[in-house]
């Protein structure tokens, strides 16, 4: 049965509206037919009438019909057709982006759009169990990302470090003595209700996670018992009663990862308990082993996570951005096929990005910048909505094609262009450490064996060539594109990087030529070890870029590293990260000469795991930015040969 709702309302030209236009829509709709017209928004009398038509079916939408919509913008009206309010909400987000401003005038771009999500789960997780984040910050993220059609917020509420959900039945769970970090910082039951309602207003599903039976030292501190014990299970059921009574949500996530199961009845009993209360249950995989019908959804983590027929799966396997660098991993994330399929179905639900705060970071906004949260989320927003992708993370990995006519390169470059537009127009007050990288070109040498002598010099330090002869062997150079390049990925050969078979105890060199139309002061983002936000790694020694003895020269002058704010020698997750990562420190201030400039990087590596750094990342980040680090430097040309 069809019915019609005629709405006449007038869009205000305000900071909450995305002025993008068809050319900058993000995520890109499935199908756009532009009519080449713009319809002026001049006054309340002339703004278009918006007609919302609720229909029983949209035959043009092949999957996830509940979230699909048809949107048509013409001179006299804007027509939205959808099956549910969800589709109407997403249509409105697209409509906001179709509003274009020119001076003090506003226009709608005329078009017809057929749109729907390829995957029904498109989300992010905040690990507030380890590091508390305010309700205001969570709301800001949810509201902002819902404009880009992110529809799931995974709330990891409990951890060893703290139980962040208020318990009226067991207040000692929230006592300072039960915490290992940020004591007594938790969400009241009223705040949880408020956040659930806020998510619903923004078309976002909130999934609370009560991690069990592992990651539960806070529980054990409060009660002096193991969750898997008879007494522990009885207490846990009462705590779950509070969750069910106060959080009006369909799903409860129960964790079950990284734990030895001493009680084989624990997980089945907890799943049954929640199901009997009308909740669907999600569990990590790897974790407890389920058969179809025994769990409602699994969330895959680590390379060992496997989707199972008959159990809907969420992909988080390579989506832990606490290990991501700012540039190269974004390429892999954008190009990756979610769950290695182009489009979701009953067994393939979608993807959730995770931020794990094993390492303490002071300041909730610093968590976002250290993890390059918003660039990663926009990449996921596009891929999870649009579907497709060229391969999984373990396919082509983090490398951009060097042929700029390659469709994979063109697709990423187009996404980057649109994402950067949104950064400079809509994320101006948000932490967003990204500039375009598809124009940054390098030549990288074959790796020279250094036999463990990281300080050893090799021919590229004397002259830059396309190939070198050294000790009877020829070493070639190869083109690479990107502001961040992995020579060997964080996860080794699991994720392809520049070298196909990287070996320890080798030294590589990378160089580029940069044309500047004038002599100018600019900033330089440079780094040789991206510090994971879930590792205990030690800060670099003062006066050194890293423990690998990496170096950088600009126009034959060696550039010194910043002064490191941390100098501790103790491996501890409770000693905060400071300015180890380039995103949180001011750019290096350098001078570019008029016309051509030369940049040379020395990239040694010893072992791939050391006492100071568990996951040695053989990589570099290097790109010029404005002195304040907010934008790209205009009119620079990167080239792998001097012209």
Where are these regions (language model features)?
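Acidic, contiguous N-terminal accessory segments
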Residues: 8-113, 283-285, 294, 413-417, ...
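Accessory carbohydrate-binding/adhesion or oligomerization-edge regions at the termini
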Residues: 21-41, 413-503, 533, 602-643
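Feature activates predominantly on carbohydrate-active enzymes
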Residues: 22-24, 64-233, 237-251, 269, ...
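Active-site neighborhood of glycoside hydrolase catalytic domains
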Residues: 219-297, 301-308
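Flexible, acidic glycine-rich loops studded with aromatic residues
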Residues: 302-439
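Short beta-strands within extracellular/lumenal beta-sheet-rich domains
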Residues: 502-515, 584-586
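A short beta-strand element within beta-rich, extracytoplasmic domains
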Residues: 518-542
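Beta-strand-rich ligand-recognition modules
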Residues: 537-539, 543-620
């Amino acid at each position: 049965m069809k019915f019609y709702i005629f709405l006449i309302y007038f869009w205000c030209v305000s900071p909450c509206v995305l002025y993008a236009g068809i050319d900058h829509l993000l995520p890109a709709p499935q199908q756009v037919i532009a009519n080449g017209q713009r319809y002026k928004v001049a006054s309340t009398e002339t703004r278009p009438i918006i007609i919302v038509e609720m229909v029983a079916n949209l035959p043009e939408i092949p999957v996830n019909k509940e979230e699909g919509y048809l949107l048509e913008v013409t001179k006299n009206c804007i027509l939205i057709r959808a099956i549910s309010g969800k589709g109407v909400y997403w249509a409105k987000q697209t409509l906001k982006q179709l509003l274009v401003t020119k001076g003090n005038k506003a226009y709608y771009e005329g078009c017809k759009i057929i749109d729907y999500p390829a995957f029904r789960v498109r989300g992010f997780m905040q690990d507030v169990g380890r590091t508390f984040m305010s309700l205001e910050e969570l709301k800001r993220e949810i509201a902002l990302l819902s404009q880009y059609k992110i529809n799931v917020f995974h709330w990891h509420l409990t951890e060893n470090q703290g139980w962040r959900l208020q318990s009226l039945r067991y207040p000692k769970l929230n006592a300072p003595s039960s915490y290992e970090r940020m004591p007594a910082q938790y969400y009241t039951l009223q705040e949880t209700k408020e956040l659930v309602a806020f998510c619903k207003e923004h078309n976002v599903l909130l999934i609370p996670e009560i991690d069990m039976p592992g990651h539960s030292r806070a529980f054990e501190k409060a009660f002096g018992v193991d969750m898997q014990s008879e007494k522990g299970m009885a207490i846990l059921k009462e705590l779950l009663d509070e969750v069910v009574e106060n959080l009006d949500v369909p799903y409860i996530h129960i964790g079950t990862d990284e734990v030895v199961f001493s009680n084989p009845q624990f997980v089945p009993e907890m799943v049954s308990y929640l199901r009997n209360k009308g909740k669907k249950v999600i569990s990590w995989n790897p974790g407890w082993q389920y058969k179809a019908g025994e769990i409602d959804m699994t969330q895959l983590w680590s390379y060992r996570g496997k989707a199972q027929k008959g159990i809907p799966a969420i992909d988080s396997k390579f989506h832990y951005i606490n290990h991501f660098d700012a540039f190269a991993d974004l390429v892999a994330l954008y190009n990756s096929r979610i769950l290695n399929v182009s489009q979701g179905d009953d067994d393939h639900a979608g993807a959730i990005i995770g931020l794990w705060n094993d390492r303490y970071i002071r300041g909730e906004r610093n968590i976002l910048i250290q993890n390059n949260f918003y660039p990663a989320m926009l990449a996921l927003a596009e891929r999870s909505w649009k579907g497709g992708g060229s391969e999984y993370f373990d396919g082509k990995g983090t490398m951009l094609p060097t042929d700029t006519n390659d469709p994979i390169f063109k697709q990423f470059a187009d996404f980057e262009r649109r994402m950067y537009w949104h950064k400079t127009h809509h994320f101006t007050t948000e932490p967003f450490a990204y500039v375009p990288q598809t124009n940054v070109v390098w030549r990288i040498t074959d790796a020279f064996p250094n036999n463990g002598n990281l300080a050893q010099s090799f021919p590229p330090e004397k002259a830059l060539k396309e190939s070198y002869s050294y000790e009877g062997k020829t070493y070639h150079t190869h083109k690479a594109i990107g502001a961040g390049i992995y020579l060997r990925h964080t996860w080794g050969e699991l994720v392809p990087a520049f070298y196909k078979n990287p070996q320890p105890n080798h030294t590589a060199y990378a160089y580029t030529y940069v044309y500047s139309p004038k002599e100018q002061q600019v900033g330089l983002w440079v780094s040789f070890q991206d510090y994971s936000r879930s590792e205990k790694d030690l800060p670099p020694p003062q006066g050194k870029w890293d423990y690998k003895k990496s170096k950088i020269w600009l126009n034959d002058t060696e550039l010194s590293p910043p002064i490191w704010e941390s100098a501790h020698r103790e491996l501890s997750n409770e000693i905060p990260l400071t300015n180890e990562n380039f995103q949180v420190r001011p750019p290096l201030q350098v001078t570019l000469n008029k016309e051509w400039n030369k940049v040379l990087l020395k990239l040694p590596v010893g072992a791939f795991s050391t006492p100071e750094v568990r996951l040695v990342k053989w990589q570099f980040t290097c790109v010029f930015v404005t002195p304040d680090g907010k934008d790209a430097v205009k009119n620079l040309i990167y080239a792998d040969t001097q012209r």
